């Protein structure tokens, strides 16, 4: 079994060694991929193609998607669910959508099997779980013929969900500020045009969503012995346009900004838009 750690959102899942994990936009995808020798010996056929291809319908077809959402306002689960299920049902052309309470550990939420049009050969299940300010969206989809092989394993993967108190291996900069994975140091002026004293600034470029970055920093700041004096979330009713933390450790005071940017070129910034990081040392 393989343990997957989502460092930004702070959760773990355990999945079979023959499964594949991939990052798909702002979600994490888990798919089974039966090696050809096993498929031939057990079922007389070979697993071929890419399980992430929607047209793939092999023995090992099926996909589990997990996506995080930042819920700083602590909105109730019901409106979040209604939005989630409405978008998903509309996209898939579903007509019958019910829901049932769902609880996993100390995370609570809702789940439903979405009944797709008869001409569609897929089964679709979805659910959302809320824990503190984090909401995890789950989606399981597979051909009806793959149900016997796929659903038991997918259920075990979802049931393995954990929120560890601490995730080891987080890197820090020279001031001791934790850095999310995949972020590289850049010149401050490459992110902010009006930096007149670059020696007192640190800047890091990456592609994590601004919601995921807020989840990361609110968890890691106290672990790394920083005191959070102020937090301005994004999005919010203010016109700040980014997320900001005021941090102090002993005599060192910093301002950390998470600056969202438009990667797609659409001209819009959303709660899942990627963000760069800038740090001002007082």
Model-derived regions, located:
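Short, solvent-exposed beta-strand edge segments and adjacent coil->beta transition regions
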Residues: 1, 61, 135-137, 199-201
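N-terminal "mature-domain start" segment
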Residues: 1-38, 162-191
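Short acidic/polar mixed-charge low-complexity motifs
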Residues: 9-13, 120-122, 134, 175-177, ...
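Surface-exposed amphipathic alpha-helical segments
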Residues: 19, 134-181, 277-282
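Conserved polar/disulfide-associated segments of primarily extracytoplasmic proteins
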Residues: 24-125, 142-144, 195-199, 205-248, ...
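Short amphipathic beta-strand starts and helix->beta connectors
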Residues: 120-124, 157, 184-189
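Short glycine/proline-enriched loop/turn "hinge" motifs that connect secondary-structure elements
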Residues: 127-132
